[in-house]
Amino acid sequence: LGYDAKSGDFLWKFNVIPQPGEYGHETWENDSWQYTGDISSWAPISADQELGQVFIPTNGVTIDYYGGHHPGDNLYGTSLISLDARTGERAWHFQMVHHDIWNFDTPTAPILLDTEAGPIVAQATKQGYVYVFNRETGEPIWPIEEVAMPASTVPGEQLSATQPIPTKPAAFEYTGSSEELLVDFTPELKRQALQAVAEFQMGPLFNPPMRANDPSGKQAALMCPSGAVNITHPPVADPESGVMYIMSRYSCSSRRLVSGEEADTYYDEPTGVTLSRFAAASGGPSPRHPAGLPLWKPPYSRITAIDLNTGEHLWMKPAGYTPDRVKNLPELSGIEIGNTGSGAVGQMVATGNMLIYSNVSSDGTP
């Protein structure tokens, strides 16, 4: 919604779920636009005063982890939208997740910079990628490719066959889950990690949730990085150098679906009746390393510096210090593991020659 800042008068409304006749309406199949919602912008909005454009990052569609009731790509869910601030007209948009069921809400404000690549807007995402566009035209600064992704085995779910992945910058965090990412400080710790994940479905970044009692025998699908926690604090950038700094952490969640009616029974006081055929089960199995280690290789949290003039990574450093609970494990006695990072994320400030950040020490204090 747009209002006159001086008078408070209402100026315009932009429908984030396109109505009949509006651009993107066809991405809501089976008339699902009529009863689906929750597309909003919980991250801050950015603006270019000279262009008169506002840049709005959006979240996904109701509900997380199952989308059989809203087939289609579902514009403008999990997108970056550029609107004319005076009229509310769409200048351009880019959808970063088609038919988002992974809780990959766009979590931070878009960053505006003038670089050697031109006037850009850079959007960091939970997926571990930064999407970079010319902020006037919406053209990607570097190619973004539609990459094939696995289909869902859950009845009624129709995932997009592809998802848009930037060719540059490279991912700033691990994406997906695989044996190669499991902790391997010693062969025995790696063996234990493999055993811990044996009953879970590993896979790429857009690994689909699976239903309980799946015919594969797996307990749940691993979603890595988890859509809830990996990047919730805003990146910062130095406008002089064009360098962006992102603090992130890698963690996974396990997702299994049950029937909508069964999902309601997990809550003592449900707010209503679930109409979805499937919904995420509350609680449920999650893999744990028997030694008390994180299952995945460090760094547990990191800061990545990306040159947005070139799209290249400049450096990566662990954020914080190795937790005492990791350093003091008997299984690691006499083994040099280096600084793993704390596993916590915090705030950052960039100056002309310094990057200042908050995190926690090895004993968990700020």
Where are each of the predicted segments found?
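Beta-sheet-rich non-transmembrane sensory/scaffold domains
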Residues: 1-366
